[in-house]
């Protein structure tokens, strides 16, 4: 037996795209969106709604929705129907600073944030809203805007594929600049970050308060399951110290969560596996309430 081995140079570039694990939740949320549109078509006008169409009056309709001019013109009673406003501006900011490097289950906090942004972006674009996404730490690392619904997720995957956690804090001035430059009217701002980042940075809290004063702000943070587990392990001195540190972390994050809620910020806190659908549900609730 004889053999021959030879090496050939074959340069190539392979781009690893971030996974869209929460895609399985998209069909059910799209169904909820369609149901919401259907229900709102028979509701009276309210904040966050726009005129949809006219239809014939049926017993049980709210008399306040009667269009008297059209009724006189047609010779029959007709009512106005309304639907949630479309073409709202949704700005999603993914924190790519040092806290995004935290290990969570099979990935990092950054992976969880990117996956959650995929689901929310797909849902919001299907709802007719304008979606803009950026990764931010001390400066903007990625930016996706002006994409149609069918192109958005692919563009996000390509742009976010090269984003890695930056070993520094999320810059409050950079966040303030990003929001002020991209937003001229009321919008929905979603910050995918960590409560740990807020608990130690008063400047960041002040910027979030300013954004929440002008816009609807959602702060989404993934819970690290290991921290909760560490609080129950106290079999020796080392584990006891770890449990004390974990308890301290939970106390600080709970205080940060309460502070953000007092500022009028919607806080979404969930496990890595449930953060994406929880964020999508919060978006649907705000849209139904006309708060976008």
Please name every model-derived segment.
Residues 143-171:
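Short, charged loop segments at secondary-structure junctions
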Residues 116, 174-178, 203:
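Well-ordered alpha-helical segments embedded in enzymatic catalytic cores
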Residues 136-139, 177, 276:
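A glycine-rich phosphate-binding loop feature that marks nucleotide/adenosyl-phosphate handling sites
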Residues 69, 165-169, 196-197, 245:
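Short, flexible loop segments at the rims of nucleotide/cofactor-binding pockets, characterized by
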Residues 20-27, 34-37, 185, 199-292:
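Von Willebrand factor type A / integrin I
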Residues 160-162, 176-183:
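A glycine- and small/hydrophobic-rich beta-loop-beta segment
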Residues 167-177, 249:
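A general structural motif
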Residues 1-151, 186-193, 199, 206-210:
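An amphipathic, basic-hydrophobic helix/alpha-beta surface used to engage anionic
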